[in-house]
């Protein structure tokens, strides 16, 4: 029982860390992209984090 609980906690910790890392990475990429080309002013970024999938929609 304790071995299963320990494994569950490890998996939960790794998933939480990977979500935070992906979130920070995507924010960094989005901020870098917004600094490069901001000529039209109509561009906005939508960031959605759903489970382990990261979607970045760049809409002009």
UniProtKB/Swiss-Prot annotation:
Any single Pfam family the record assigns to this protein: DUF2729
Name under which the protein is recorded: Uncharacterized 7.1 kDa protein in IAP2-VLF1 intergenic region
Source organism per UniProt: Autographa californica nuclear polyhedrosis virus (AcMNPV)
Lineage: Viruses, Viruses incertae sedis, Naldaviricetes, Lefavirales, Baculoviridae
């Amino acid at each position: 029982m304790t071995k299963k609980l320990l494994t569950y906690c490890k998996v939960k910790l790794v998933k939480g860390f990977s979500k935070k890392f992906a979130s920070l990475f995507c924010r960094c990429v989005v901020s870098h992209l917004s600094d490069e080309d901001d000529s039209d002013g109509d561009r906005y970024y939508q960031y959605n984090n759903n489970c382990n999938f990261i979607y970045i929609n760049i809409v002009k």
